[in-house]
Regions:
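Residue-level signal for inorganic ion chemistry
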Residues: 1, 22, 34, 68, ...
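Divalent metal-dependent hydrolysis catalytic cores, especially in the metallo-beta-lactamase
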Residues: 1-41, 64-67, 102, 150
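Divalent metal-binding pocket/active-site signature
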Residues: 8-18, 45-48, 55-147, 167-168, ...
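Short, acidic/turn-prone active-site loops that include or flank metal/cofactor-
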Residues: 37-40, 135, 155-159, 183-184
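Residue-level marker for buried hydrophobic side chains located in beta-strands
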Residues: 65, 177-179
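His/Asp/Glu-enriched short active-site or ligand-binding loop at hydrolase and phosphoryl-transfer sites
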Residues: 148-162
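Active-site hotspot residues in diverse enzymes, especially metal/ion-binding acidic/histidine motifs
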Residues: 203
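Conserved small/polar residues in nucleotide/adenosyl-binding loops
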Residues: 220-226
Length: 226
C-alpha cells in the first residue's frame, strides 16, 4: 500500500458483521484504522446490544470515528422506516458525542432530514465529522461547511456527468475536502466499473486538483497535514 503513496486507511463498518473484520484489519496492519457504526439500511436490525457493542469498540485505540451512520431513503420509502433510521442515527450520534469521536455520515435521498439532525447535534456540541460521498447541491454543501464539517469526495468526481459534484468541489475550501474510496464501489475513471481500492485515490486527487487549478502534489500534501 505504501508503494501507492497511501500511508493510512480508515476502514469503515456498515454492519454488525463488519465489526470484527475491521478489528482484525486494525490489528494486522499498522496503517489501518477503524470507524464503527451501522449503515441506515440495517437500522431496523439494531438493538440495544448493537449500540452497546458500538460503544465498546469505540474505546479501542485505533477506532477513530463513529460511522458509517445516517439516513438512506432511496430504498426505504415508508415513514415508519424513516423514523427507525432517524432513531438509530440519533443513538449513534449520541455515542459519538459521549465518546468524543467524529462521525462519518451516509445520506441518500434524505438531504433535509440529515441536515436538520446534524445541525441539531452540532449546535449541542460535537467533535466534527465527514459527510461521506457527498452528492447533494452546492447549497447543502454550504450548510455543512459552515458547521466546520468535511465533505468526502470519491471516484464520482472523475465522471463526466458529475456536474453538480464538480461545482461543489470548486466551491468548497480545499481544507474541508477529504479523499474517499467507498471501496469496493465507485471506482474512478479510468477504472470505473472495477473493484475500487485506496490505490485509486491518485485519480480522485488529480481530478480535485484540476478543478481547483492546483497541482495534485500540493493538494495531497495539504490534506495530509490537516
Amino acid at each position: 500500500m505504501y508503494d501507492g503513496g497511501i500511508e493510512k486507511i480508515v476502514n469503515v463498518c456498515a454492519s454488525v458483521g463488519g465489526f470484527q473484520d475491521t478489528v482484525k484489519l486494525m490489528e494486522k496492519y499498522p496503517f489501518v484504522y477503524g470507524a464503527v457504526g451501522i449503515h441506515p439500511d440495517d437500522a431496523d436490525k439494531m438493538t440495544q446490544e448493537t449500540l452497546d457493542e458500538i460503544r465498546r469498540l469505540s474505546h479501542m485505540d485505533k477506532m477513530v470515528a463513529i460511522g458509517e451512520i445516517g439516513l438512506d431513503y432511496y430504498w426505504h420509502k415508508e415513514e415508519d422506516e424513516h423514523q427507525i433510521q432517524k432513531k438509530m442515527f440519533r443513538a449513534q450520534l449520541d455515542i459519538a458525542r459521549e465518546e468524543k469521536l467524529p462521525f462519518m455520515i451516509h445520506s441518500r435521498e434524505a438531504a433535509e432530514d440529515t441536515l436538520n439532525i446534524v445541525r441539531e447535534y452540532m449546535q449541542g456540541g460535537m467533535y466534527g465529522g465527514i459527510i461521506h460521498c457527498f452528492s447533494y447541491s452546492r447549497e447543502i454543501a454550504a450548510e455543512y461547511l459552515k458547521m466546520g464539517l468535511y465533505l468526502g469526495i470519491g471516484g464520482v468526481v472523475t465522471f463526466k456527468n458529475a456536474k453538480k459534484l464538480k461545482e461543489t468541489v470548486q466551491y468548497a475550501p480545499l481544507s474541508q475536502l477529504v479523499l474517499e474510496t467507498d471501496c469496493p464501489y465507485m471506482s474512478p475513471e479510468p477504472n470505473r466499473g472495477k473493484r475500487n481500492s485506496s490505490l485509486n485515490l491518485p485519480y480522485v486527487a488529480q481530478a480535485i486538483a484540476e478543478l481547483k487549478g492546483i497541482t495534485c502534489l500540493l493538494y495531497t500534501s495539504d490534506a495530509a497535514d490537516e
